[in-house]
Amino acid sequence: MSVAELPIAIDREKIAVFCRARGIRKLSLFGSVLRDDFDPQRSDVDVLAEFAPGVRPGLRFFGYGEELAEIVGHKVDFNTEAWLSQYFRDEVVREALPIYEQA
């Protein structure tokens, strides 16, 4: 799937501004938003963030999902690879669709 085929609108410029301001070097989508079972009325958007080396977001991390929700218009479940369960981490990383990558 490509970003153009997603069932939600992604403003890549707003996403880029969000990521640059927070030291995120890669932001990807995973989960139901990439599959046919995504329900725009009920589903949240699963996001996987990779921070640049040395970036430590601290407690601000917990507000990033709400900030992204305002950009994408859906509730966001904000994650890093370390926060994902070891039982499905590898699968998530394999299926993730990047929507921002630091140049």
What do the PLM-derived regions correspond to, one by one?
Residues 46-49:
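Short, aliphatic-rich beta-strand segments
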Residues 1-28, 34-41, 51-103:
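Catalytic core of pol beta-like nucleotidyltransferases
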